[in-house]
């Protein structure tokens, strides 16, 4: 029987810092606490890495991240991520599911991307905006470079810190935790006209599967009519939605991930109330515990492997993996390792690198898990 978290309360910055340091100190063999930068008011943007080899990228092991509290008054994600840290630490080595997850995945958890906004927000805020923005009063989820619109707000320190973090690690999968509705929102988040229509990414099928992997473990979310009292007409079949079809978000973080890194990110709305009372928090953990774990497991779906040099057998960095008919190549990391999320099907996959002859393989992906596909390239 897995041990459940007990620390259910709202953690202000100093409490969160104490919590993170405590778990980093108590579980040094599976944790590493680091910061990716500072907020406007110079609070650390902490990340807890949970892995069986903290601080090290293991060749072939995918990297995963959760980001919470990007909007400072949307606090459920922040607390769930602290619960998740506690849960993973306390169950590693005893619970087989947690042990397997931590041994096979390098997990990075950022409980708060907007610690300044959080300090301004108020417990009991249902649908307000106080504390949503950062200290310079900019919305961080409208602050990333956008494919369709020129973002005119100056780039914020929190945004820049996260962008450089995303360029530092080979993240494969991510979720950005928000509040104010109950749905998993997937790319694209906007479209050329800036109107509410379905804006399909090349990996629409993958994103739908990822979104469903979360929503179907959350009974209330999966039912699809989340906030009857606040938004009576809102209906999301199976608790998922294309971002732009719901409403336009130019400058959002999830699309930037997909368009500028190898990482697939979705945005998860965890509940209709943005800052619920502390006594509600155990209920949110209960509703989302399975979803949070199932979503991490999705990082192992699709294909993964190595692109190697035929002469010396070394990994080739920055080789390109492209899948026929899906316009979204991914690149290899320093050991020549790559991960490409895909749904069930048959694919033609090509590995190419500068100065080498490309190699194409036909690959069968089943519904269960990941298939290892290695490529050996010869110099031209």
Curated annotation (Swiss-Prot):
The active site is at residue 269. One of its GO terms (molecular function) is metallocarboxypeptidase activity. Residues 9-299 form the Peptidase M14 domain. Coiled coil: none annotated. It holds the Pfam family Peptidase_M14. GO terms for cellular component: extracellular space; membrane. It catalyses: Releases C-terminal Arg and Lys from polypeptides. The keyword Zinc applies. Its cofactor is Zn(2+). Zn(2+) binds at residues 71, 74, 178. Disulfide bonds join 227-272. It comes from the Eukaryota. Residues 117-126 have a biased composition (Basic and acidic residues). Binds 2 Zn(2+) ions per subunit. Keywords: Carboxypeptidase, Disulfide bond, Glycoprotein, Hydrolase, Metal-binding, Metalloprotease, Protease, Zinc. Its EC number is 3.4.17.22. Belongs to the peptidase M14 family. This is Carboxypeptidase D. The lineage of its organism: Eukaryota, Metazoa, Chordata, Craniata, Vertebrata. The gene is CPD.
